[in-house]
Each structure stands twice: as C-alpha cells, then as structure tokens.
C-alpha cells in the first residue's frame, strides 16, 4: 500500500489553530452551552503561534481533567480555559486527519462499492466549502490556509456564520436521521431484522491496531504520538461515552467518534464484500401460471442473461455473482420496461451502522440469518477484538423492531381485499344509512306495493343499466363488497355470479396459489434441513467405530453439501410485480446518490432520486411505553403513578441550570423523534416535563406552584426585557405548531444521545 508523509510539523500552523478557534466560536452554541464569550475572547493571537510551535516540538501539555460541561455553567475557571484550548487543538487535528483519510482510503485503497458506501462517514467538509466558498482553493488531502487571503479576514467569517453553523449541524446532528432515512428505502419484502450492539472494550491491543491503521497510510509516527497522549489522559477514548453527544462531556469528543468509525471501518468492508460475493438480488425460474408471452420473456432471459438453463430447481454459487454481475444489472433494465409478473429467488442483506449500533434487514431464509450471524460475530471477535451483546432477531410481521430507541414498522400498501377488510366498519355504516333512507322513503310513499316492485326492479337491473346513478351504484358496490368479505370461499367457486372482471379473478387465484407454493417451499426447506441434520448425527455415531478415509470423505461431502445448499438460504418471492421492479430499480440509483452525496443539500442528484423519495416502505414510531420508563428512571415522572414530580437530582443547582437542563432534554427528545409518524403525540410528554420543571423549582425554594408560574410564566422564561427574552424551554405556541419533520435542531442546544442509546 502506498504511504505518504502526513507531516504534522507542516500541517499544524498558527493559521490552522486560528481557523479551528474561529469555527468553534461560530458554532459555540452547538458544543459548549454557554452564553458569554469570556473564554473565547481571552485567547490571543500569540497563543496560536506558541501552541503550534509546542505541538511541533512535542512539548504541548494536555489537560488532565475529563471534560465536564457543568463546570462551564458555574464559572470560567482556569481549568475550563485549558479544556477550551484542548478543544481547539482537537478540532484542528480532526481537520487534518479527516481530509487525509478521505484521499488515502477512499480513493487509492478501496474499490468503488466500498467508496460509495462509506464516503459519508468522513467527507462532510469539501461539499460545504465548495458551495459556500467557491473561491476557496481546496485540496482533498488538506486545504491550504492562506494568511493574507482568507484567515485574517475576520469580517468574512462573521458574515458567513450561517455556513459554519450549517457545517457543524449537518455533520454532527443528522447522522441518526440519515440512518433512519436509509432504512426507509429498504426492500418491502424484508421478513427478518437483526440488531446488534458492539461492546467497546478499548485496551492495549486495540490501541496498537489503531496505530497500525495509521502506519498503513503514513510513516509520520510523530502524529500518532500526540494522539497517544490524548488516549492516556482519557481525553480521547472510543470505549467510553465520549463518542456520543451528551450533556456531560462538553458536547462530544469529535476525535473519539472519528477513531471509532475508523476502527470499525474494516467491519464495514467485510460486510460489503460478503454482500457482494454471497448475496444476489434475484434469480428467475418458470412458474406454473406461465402464458405464452411470459414464456417468451423467460426464454429470452435464459438465453441472454443467465448462463445456466434452469428447469425446476437451480443452484447459484457465490462466484457466479462476480462473473455475471453485469448481466444481473441488464436483466433488471430489461424487465423494467415489460409489465410482466415472474417469480424469483432472492437473497440480500441491508444494514445500517450508527457508531456501535447495527441493524440488519434480511431478504432470505432463517438458515442464512444464523449462518451470517456466526460469520460476522466471528469476524468481530477474532479480527477487531470486539465483543458484542444484545443480539436480537425480529420477525417483521410479528415482533416490534426497536433500533436507536425507535420502533420500525412497515408502510403497508393494501390491495383490493385488504382495503375491504380494513374499511368493513365504514361499509357497514354506509349500508345502514342506505337502509335507513330506504325505510324513510317507504313510509313516505302511499303505494308500498308499487314501490317494492320498483325497488326490486332497480335492484336486479342496477348493473349495468342504471350504474351511472349515484345512489344505486353506491348501494351495489357496498353490498357486493360485504358479500365478498363474508363469502370469500364461495367467491372462487361460483365466479360467474359476480360482477368482477375475469382478469381480477384470475390474478387473485394466481396470488393465492403462489402463497401456497411459498408455504410449501418453506416447508420443504425445513424438512430437508432436518433430514441433513439427522444424517450428520448418524454419521457421527458411525465414525466413532470406524475411521476409514472413505467415511471421512463422505462425512465432509455431506457437511459441505449442507453448508453450500443455496435453497436453504434463499427467500422464495412468488410475486414480483412491475411496481416493485420499477421502484427497486430507481431505489438502487437513489441509494448510490444517498451514500455519495448525503448532507450536501441535495447536490448532484440523478434522474431517479426525485422520483424514488415518494416510495418509502418503512415507518418509524415513538415507543411511548419505553419512553415512559425512561422518564421514570430520570426522575421526571412518579415511579408508580402517571403524574409528574420534581426531579430530586437537580435541587442543588441554580435556577438557570435547572431551566437549561430541562430545556436541553426537551429539545433532544424533539430532535431525536422528529422523523417518527406519531411525533404529534410527544406534546403530551413535553407538557409533563414542563410540569416537572415547575415542581422542581417549587421544591427547591419551598414555594407553592403558583409562585413558579408568577416568576417564570407558563413558558418558563428566564429573563425578559424590552430587547431580549431568554427562554431555554420551548414555548407552548411553538409546541402546538410543531409538526413532523418541521423541527431539525435549535441553535441554542446540543443533542443528548445518551438518553436514547443507553
């Protein structure tokens, strides 16, 4: 692998530290939670020159105290001043490392698939600079700082504070939202999920391995010496909560999150290679209901796209995926423009990693899920030296999948009969209204016998003679819908008695037959798996008495046959409609653009991206029961009753800190669950937290609740003047007008991820 010199002595300059300080100052509300500039303004220009020279010589002294944000709230001590200096140095190091690894990892040493999939983990800076600062000379390895042209123009930065704020907010606040956004476009036929949490036990072995990662790309060992000092002082650590945004660690440690992603990057490469070699998207085979036109497409596919002539069953080895990857792409394009239904075998894996949390979506059998689980967990233990816990496998139809504190559910698209079942109650109500109007009309008529004859005549001949009349068409539709629901079995026996077209009846029969074949296929796989397992167990007993080489070879052949039996790993998909083919084709292109250009304000989108956004197969919901338990553990709600109480943990702090802590928590909740469908129901929990804040203030001052209302008003306003109003808690008007996805991040507060991830 090609190595280059990172050359810390040339990169760390006073201009770089000045830019790091200026960027933190513009984005200080995201990281520090203070409302004064006393610490930022106390840093002089000479400090940048002195610090850069000390870092180059290796004499810079790092603070020995962990970063605590609550110390910042109380006073501006010398200890906090040293911690701020460390944040400036840490941010400067991150600027160098991030852009260096963009070029070295994702351009020279990676294939195209890995580059596309992982480029969003590190490439945040370049697109924002290119958009906001088009005249700025920028390099992938490291953008140069020009003393006279850019850095000393303080007015330029002051006029572009929004750019710096957008840069920090998009990079560090929307990674979880991007993970949920990616899950929305997974395949709708996913049947099983697997969640996993990696235990971050950082020791000497991991530190040496991280050092070896640096040595692969650079021979500048002096750079890692400075990083090793940070690890020894616990200022940077990938095994602690420093990787999360929280209220206890000064926002977060940016280097800790970066090093964790860099360390687990090899695991992402392993997953990409495994998916590329083992999994396939679709394989065709001929079905029972094959018409002449369908058989033509089938024969055309066998001749042009698939190298093997397939009859009833076929096997696909992993190496065929590499040889015929282009043909699989062409077959998707071919069937895109032909509205034909065909049947497929499918086997694919979808996954998303957020720091040390992973979720997998499987389009395969359960045998393949356990096979993949053993492979990946073996890789984590033996290659990355990481352990794991909380490995759970969920069925998408029965179980509630929870990832990052959010429920994942299907965005179901109902067919004709499912709509009738869902709306059965509505149909019955309409039917009762029609009967009521019918009875009222009967009473109004004088000649009941004459009316009954007319009504029976209309009822028998409403279709097709009087179909255009609104009342009779509604009556006919709802009565027939109700009959279909009640006599579903008779619907398939006496099809000529119903008004539905023949094509719909034929397609319905086809769907039910394919559902039955799917069930029989799964049953066949299970019986075959049990049979092979029994054979292996019997051969184990036989080998205990005989150790002939032929027996060993036969045993190995049976074991390999069971291991490489593709039918046991595939998922049988009987219905692969034109809608799903076309949208999957578009979503494949959309996923490419998402991984390449996410967080870049929608730049460089292809033709398919804008159309694919409306086809989302998964929804997210707030788990209110889990969230209620979290509120009780944090002390906002009574442990046994459903009512707010005063938080005992905050009684010793000042009122300003209490108000800010409650507001910080509420904004974190609104940020995290802004993507959920039931986001509007969070208003009730926000009001509970508001009442808990009032009760906490009353308990601290030993006053009545009316006293807190009179002092801080109902919106918890800390101070109010003619020109400025300081309020850390969202107002009631803001909460009432808040809608889903309309709230992203408030400029005054950071995001506390430890509430949802622990």
UniProtKB/Swiss-Prot annotation:
One of its GO terms (molecular function) is RNA-directed DNA polymerase activity. This is Maturase-like protein 2. Keywords: Chloroplast, Plastid. It comes from Euglena gracilis. PANTHER family: COX1/OXI3 INTRON 1 PROTEIN-RELATED, NUCLEAR INTRON MATURASE 4, MITOCHONDRIAL. It is found in: Plastid, Chloroplast. The lineage of its organism: Eukaryota, Discoba, Euglenozoa, Euglenida, Spirocuta. GO terms for biological process: homing of group II introns; mitochondrial mRNA processing. Its main location: plastid. GO terms for cellular component: chloroplast; mitochondrion. The keyword Secreted does not apply.
